[in-house]
Amino acid sequence: GDTGEDSHSGTATTNQTWEEMQAAALLPFEAGIAAGADVVMAAHITTPNATQDGLPASLSYTMLTERLRGELGFTGVICTDALEMKAISSHYAPADAAVAALNAGADILLMPADLCAAFEGVVQAVETGAVAEERLNESVRRILTLKEKAGLPLGTAAPAEEPTAPEAAEEAVPEKPSACFGWLRALWS
């Protein structure tokens, strides 16, 4: 809204403060959260007067975790806008953008510029501890909970006749995230 730049072609910035954003730009988000929205898409807009990190909202822990989850109370799935957009791909390598988005609190990383590089970057970040396994598991649980709520299968098994409690999604998360990576790695071999 409050920018003349398109994130598809460059860096979009709003100079609004957090309070100004809450008074106008965030009203639809607050209404959606109050109505039970399951997913929020994080834009690649920088907000220098609302956060001091200088990052696009989609890569900002302050914006996604502290503000969206903490202050606004959103508990659903956070999806980034397309990571191949110039606001991200002109400034970050695919692996760096993917790791930053996960550490910021994003659950789904939409369209990285190079999926294989982003995937390998996340795998390496988990293996080295740059992304905590539990952080990745939080995203898996949120996504599985959303799938269960929608009546979608949680894996290769047929969907349950009746949705079960959200605890079922938690049980579906493997002990080690590396167990999830085997089939994905096979795609790139």
Residue ranges of model-derived segments:
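Secretory-pathway/luminal and periplasmic proteins that interact with or process carbohydrate-rich
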Residues: 3-5, 148-152
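A glycine-rich phosphate-binding loop feature that marks nucleotide/adenosyl-phosphate handling sites
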Residues: 119, 140, 158-161
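Flexible, glycine/charged-enriched surface loops at secondary-structure junctions
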Residues: 129-138, 152-157
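Short amphipathic alpha-helical coiled-coil/interface segments
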Residues: 140-147
